[in-house]
């Protein structure tokens, strides 16, 4: 019997790229309206589950703060934090997930950096 070797990085990348194609909930970008609300200070992000992160976890004012969104491509958290004033870098293993962030940034005039790498 031959051992099957699975490359976890390649497997993860392919899975998340497919999720984007399928419209998975973690791959659906935020709306332009969500971005506009974030610009006005009315924002929230969800990291796991369905409940927004407690705002006390983050500074009251994100203006100029450096934020690393690790393994969080998909056009959700990074764009919202960028709209709230943070300098955002989104690091993810999926080119398509990062593409969602890039699409929102271009659509809504946001500055954020995306970095592709294994996670």
Where does each model-flagged region fall?
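Conserved alpha-helix/loop element of class I SAM-dependent methyltransferases that forms part
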Residues: 28-65
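Conserved N-terminal segment of class I S-adenosyl-L-methionine
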Residues: 14, 21, 53, 66, ...
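Mixed-charge, polar/low-complexity N-terminal
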Residues: 1-2, 6-8, 33, 42-43, ...
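N-terminal, positively charged/glycine-rich alpha-helical extensions of SAM-dependent methyltransferases
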Residues: 1-37
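Class I SAM-dependent methyltransferase SAM/SAH-binding core
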Residues: 65-119
């Amino acid at each position: 019997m031959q051992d099957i070797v699975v490359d976890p990085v390649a497997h993860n990348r392919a899975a998340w790229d497919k999720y984007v194609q399928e419209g998975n909930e973690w791959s659906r970008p935020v709306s332009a309206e969500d971005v506009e609300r974030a610009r006005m200070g009315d924002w929230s992000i969800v990291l796991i589950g369905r409940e927004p992160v407690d705002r006390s976890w983050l500074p009251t004012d994100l203006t100029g703060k450096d934020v690393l969104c690790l393994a969080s491509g998909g056009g959700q958290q990074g764009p919202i934090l960028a709209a709230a004033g943070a300098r955002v870098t989104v690091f993810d293993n999926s080119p398509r997930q990062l593409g969602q962030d890039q699409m929102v940034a271009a659509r809504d005039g946001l500055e954020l950096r995306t970095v592709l790498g294994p996670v």
